[in-house]
């Protein structure tokens, strides 16, 4: 009987010694997943009034021209340096309509073959009168 009592006391002490202590091994947690880097291309006419190609994700690191070519059927001039048509919608020099492009809502200052898209960039192409700036930028183009 004494053995049983002693065994029971030792068992209770062992349980008490284990309780209340945090494990020294850290819990394994999955690292939060980061969204894949992405840029986007949007094509409109009349300063965003009509959507030709909805905002489409593309991989960053490629040129604006390459990204456009991947999401739309394009026609170019001058050895591929100038866009003259997108998805069958052609420029019209008689009406002073040209395809102009913007990055993050700002007019591009280089040719599309020279500008590389970064993560988060939005490339917006719009067919409008080249003598006028668009008064506003479509929400999807910023």
Regions found by a protein language model. Give the residues of each.
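Ubiquitin-like/PB1-type beta-grasp interaction modules and other compact soluble beta-rich domains
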Residues: 2-12, 18-142
